Amino acid sequence: MVQDVDILWFRNPFERMSVAAHMVTSSDFFFGDPYSPMNLPNTGFLYAKSSRRTVGAFEAWRRARESFPGKHEQQVLNEIKVELVSTRGLRIQFLDTDHNAGFCNNTRDFNTLYTMHANCCVGLGAKLHDLGNLLREWRAYRSMDEGERSRGPVRWKVPGICIH
């Protein structure tokens, strides 16, 4: 399990992960099928099951960096994910953005939110500002009674630097 430091956990994201997946990654953009390589990965949240298959996939991923000079590891994974799935049989689960959101695709409902990643946000100050506001809103949400929460989506009200 590897994750960026700009991710808030509101609930346990392992509840959303399939035991059948060899690798699980968050998504910048999610298109409905958790196993479709058409989803765009965000390796800020990455889990890999220990196996020969995943070790081979990580080795291929590392070697592939030479074929894509100037691209960072997430961009390289995006380039080779179809090959990893079709040729190596790697089962990659892309976490849906309704439950594991980011600033790119702000789900805005605390009732369904597991994690929030400060992606699509430039600068540590901006990330800390918006994540701090979000954490304050989460605390207010947690202080609500169950009846208030069950009336529908509980949305946060923070206009931020990166969250709009």
Regions found by a protein language model. Give the residues of each.
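Catalytic core and acceptor-binding pocket of nucleotide-sugar-dependent glycosyltransferases
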Residues: A48-H164
